[in-house]
From Swiss-Prot:
One of its GO terms (cellular component) is endoplasmic reticulum membrane. Residues 171-189, 234-242, 302-322 are lumenal. This is Very-long-chain (3R)-3-hydroxyacyl-CoA dehydratase 3. It is found in: Endoplasmic reticulum membrane. Its EC number is 4.2.1.134. The gene is Hacd3. It comes from Mus musculus (Mouse).
Length: 362
């Protein structure tokens, strides 16, 4: 005996570019919905007029449609959307003139052609308005947002490093050399904040928000945080040494010239004195900072050897103990290599800025 094919109730509506079909099946499982040779094929397990069964139907469309139907399942029905290949109104849904018994208009969504024309015109106007706004307003808006973001970032960093610089300077004039030994406990929190925030600077260079080369920014970020978090931050014996003062002072002295220069660049201002300081003060300050960091690393080697912190033993068959001081010695080599890379980068910047004036003098 031939199995009876069960068809669900299907309601349809249209717009100029789309067809909508609502299949009256609840609790649908395993739906198979596809379009081949301009025919919509539907088959699914669900609860319909004949109870919980497998329902299916096939509809050959009146005109050409795109072969990728979209559908959405709800608890009570299946909503199918089909894109027309041409934007025009159909007089009926199917190629056969006689409407299938299971098919009916969806009066909840139905529009006549004049209503649909008005809706289409409204959507087109909305799209054109959106494109015009994007074309006219978007580039300027994005540029302003970028400038505002960079200005605020540089301002926050300037305030942070200025606080450190002023704090260290005032305490030195009041306490003299005694101020060297508790530098870490007085300004470490602010230095942690500024150096963690410096990650943003590296990311800006990496994603193209700024034109800064990634390598110099990354070298400075990793180098400083190695000193701050590992050498100083993990060993209390290092936090009371005078070298902390010189490291923090050189870092903050460099940044109080660099960040205000970047701030003014965001608003297209050029203060000649500040520009000269930004392109000149690094010449003595970067080597002093590098020397201070090297002294800090050298002083920390016996401290790490004595404590054994971060040391580890290689697994069998090597079974060799690797001290953290080995990595500190490697870092010393990398420190001066990084200094060379940054020095070279800054020298090129200075030559681009002032090189032409020197040529004109000869």
């Amino acid at each position: 005996m031939e199995t009876q094919v069960l068809t669900p109730h299907v309601y349809w509506a249209q717009r100029h570019r789309e067809l909508y079909l609502r299949v009256e099946l609840s609790d649908v499982q395993n739906p198979a919905i596809s379009i081949t040779d301009n025919v919509l094929h539907f088959k699914a397990q669900g609860h319909g007029a004949k109870g919980d069964n497998v329902y299916e139907f096939h509809l050959e469309f009146l005109d050409l449609v795109k072969p990728e139907p979209a559908y959405r399942l709800t608890q009570r029905q299946v909503n199918i959307t089909v894109q027309k290949k041409g934007s025009h109104w159909w007089e009926r849904l199917t190629k056969q003139e006689k409407r299938p018994l299971f098919l009916a208009p969806d009066f909840d969504r139905w529009l006549d052609e004049s209503d649909a024309e008005m809706e289409l015109r409204a959507k087109e106007e909305e799209r054109l308005n959106k494109l015009r706004l994007e074309r006219e307003g978007s580039p300027e808006t994005l540029t302003n947002l970028k400038k505002g973001y960079l200005f605020m970032y540089n301002l926050v960093q300037l305030l942070g490093f200025s606080w450190i610089f002023v704090n260290l300077t005032v305490r030195f004039f009041i306490l003299g050399k005694e101020s060297f030994y508790d530098t870490f406990h007085n300004v470490a929190d602010m230095m942690y904040f500024c150096q963690m925030l410096a990650l943003v600077e590296t990311l800006n260079a990496a994603i193209g928000v700024t034109s800064t080369p990634v390598l110099p920014a990354l070298i400075q970020f990793l180098g400083r945080n190695f000193i701050l978090f590992l050498v100083f931050g993990t060993m209390e014996e290092m936090q009371n040494k005078a070298v902390v003062f010189f490291v923090f002072y050189s870092w903050s002295a460099i940044e109080i010239f660099r960040y205000p220069f970047y701030m003014l660049s965001c608003i297209d201002m050029d203060w000649k004195v500040l520009t000269w300081l930004r392109y000149t003060m690094w010449i003595p300050l970067y080597p002093l900072g590098c020397l201070s960091e090297a002294v800090a690393v050298i002083q920390s080697i016996p401290v790490f050897n004595e404590s054994g912190r971060f040391s580890f033993t290689l697994p069998y068959p090597v079974k060799m103990k690797v001290r953290f001081s080995f990595f500190l010695q490697v870092y010393l080599v990398m420190l001066f290599l990084g200094l060379y890379i940054n020095f070279r980068h800054l020298y090129k910047q200075r030559r681009r800025r002032y090189g032409q004036k020197k040529k004109k003098l000869h």
